[in-house]
């Protein structure tokens, strides 16, 4: 029975209202294991070798309900792991294998993930056996690694630590299209580059259309899209070729007939009795040689369950021409026909299949730079093996953050540059007495309270909980590219850093013992000291928690190009809006708050507190609704909620507003869209009314201190 009625909710009546639901993800407890469950601890108790034995045995245990191609599930699990990790994009760090989100909508129902629902069902007995010790996120990736190893490939390593999600990540912007496998003009900039924050070129596909742009066998356009999409996943040309060539050494694509005529609804739209399985195939037996996935049909070589050089050799040594396959999709066949009927059948090895290539494969050969990499690999098979192993390791771990979060006995000793390495603290950390002395010196320096707070915020607020990058640890704010970002006011930052470095040098040089202070710790300590002073000036005695132990990264440990992806287009907490911001500033504020793992309450108290402290970009007066900036009061909220005033737009673009006295018409204050958000949005106004109450200023101060402290240690994985 279908229910055609629709109960209208708030978002239906007012679809243009700012959506705060992505912040609710940070406040809700939806883990069935409970909020005290420590997955890292559970994983450390896992017998990883036993799990791998179970996985390897399963690889060749073909099931009648979904038989293994060539008697081996390995290629299916490689695709599953790749498509889990491959959703990662550098712009905002979202996507990736963490959370096991491939089993949740919308990714579970993407057209690029057809029949991966069966792969996960094949894994269920193993997940069932190990339970909480092994997350879906880790199992999906581990299955891909074991698949490679079971077919003769030597992987570089494996790290566990991916705690599962149990709800979809609504914060991810997958693109503007409302139909699968489409590409609108709004996905790309005029120069053909993907718009922020997108990483895939087609809605519902991991990277690019395997038939070519817009389903046409355009080699040049395909290579351009590959470079753009893989680049947004932080892969260079060599890594890109290694991944594609390595992955396509195994298995086949499936297009026994036309998908549109034979394949049913995706899992999210399938009938209830299908129990989450989608894409029911009515062609033939619907499985085995009759399987339909992408609509493209055939293997890349004659040894689809064995690691060798045959993919690279076939691609380079034969001439290829486009044709429509049995599924009606564009694919490529050898001009000579030499590889026709040369590969074994998926179920009966006495049957034969044609070897084929995708448009995206032939594009690698056609593009001069990609071809050069292919030829290098052909001449040096060992280099190909090593390049694929490291690129694969990067692919499946890119969203896990620094090496401190990598768990298990197969974690490599080497730390990669993409893990944003940090030096160890080879000195004694500052004690309480030293902390007190340093705070006094910082407050007595030429740096004002707003400058101290602003510098600490600029350092810590680069953190992204999506891929665990950024943050105050490392003091990379003193290195390129961060020290030159417009949002950080380079000239003012330069002066502040000089003061910090002088205080650090004076302290460290004066010590006769092994105690030292890092610049990373000192910057955070400066912000803490300023907040304590600002609270005292408002009549409140607070102690801002401080945990020393941050170290200072070197330029050699910092990939400038990689860190450029962390550059904010806007920071509503500092009332900064960059020229290249393509969304409303209030939307970008919520997006940044979500990346900082903040709730709506956290976001509100932080904005109010930072405004009271005078922390704005360029020392702007926007949002400074107080006569005593630098004092931790709730003036931002009391002024915003005062009905003796009214707001008027002061610019045609409605980015700046004036607060006028209702009686005199005099302009008292100016504010941005971000500032006005806390009075206009009903949810945020409700929170603002709490912090704007006369009886609750102390609550505001304490909540600000608590939230500030959480932001300052978001990247302190060493404390977990």
Swiss-Prot record:
Q: How is the cofactor bound?
A: Binds 1 heme b (iron(II)-protoporphyrin IX) group per dimer.
Q: Read off the lineage from the record.
A: Archaea, Methanobacteriati, Methanobacteriota, Stenosarchaea group, Halobacteria
Quaternary structure, per UniProt, is: Homodimer or homotetramer.
Annotated protein name in UniProt: Catalase-peroxidase
Q: Give the reaction(s) catalysed.
A: H2O2 + AH2 = A + 2 H2O; 2 H2O2 = O2 + 2 H2O
Q: Which residues are listed for heme b binding in this entry?
A: 248
- EC number(s): the record gives 1.11.1.21
Its needed co-factors are: heme b
What organism does the UniProt record list as the source?
Halobacterium salinarum (strain ATCC 700922 / JCM 11081 / NRC-1)
Name of the gene encoding the protein in the UniProt record: katG
